[in-house]
Amino acid sequence: MLKVFETMNKATHHIFQVLTKRPQRLFEMKNDIDWSENIWIGTTVESEKYIYRIKYIEEIPARVKFLSLEPLLGPINNINLNGIDWVIVGGESGFASRPVKKEWIIDIKDMCKVKNIPFFFKQWGGVNRKKAGKELDGKIFTEMPAKSTTRNNKLTTACFLF
């Protein structure tokens, strides 16, 4: 895994969004990794059951830290967004997908607004996610972290399950 991070550090013309459901592994390795500014770190939080993952992200010295609340499977109340630079929310997609409730999304969007954190609403989900769309109250939310606009990089998403 360290070799992957070495490669990302060398490719400074890209921004890598590293998303994991196991942030404790990165936390354990945080001092062994050179956290160059083109490496963003995020974790998936599907419901309140997984809020504990956020504490690991907060302690990793990445330039941009983000949460992917997707698929959002339940309300997430009183989430600690201190040190978080970006929040992505979306419903579950595919066959037998579980529905997301609008009020869950609105609550998270409002929390982001209070903390001045960019909010990105990816999708409503469902069997046909294109048909369901990504409008929320007549708007499309595709906000990005301000830190991302200071560089002229190509955005590359790298997802690792480790």
Model-derived features with residue positions:
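Core AdoMet radical
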Residues: M1-M29, I33-G74, D85-V100
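Auxiliary Fe-S-binding modules of radical SAM enzymes
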Residues: L73, N78-F162
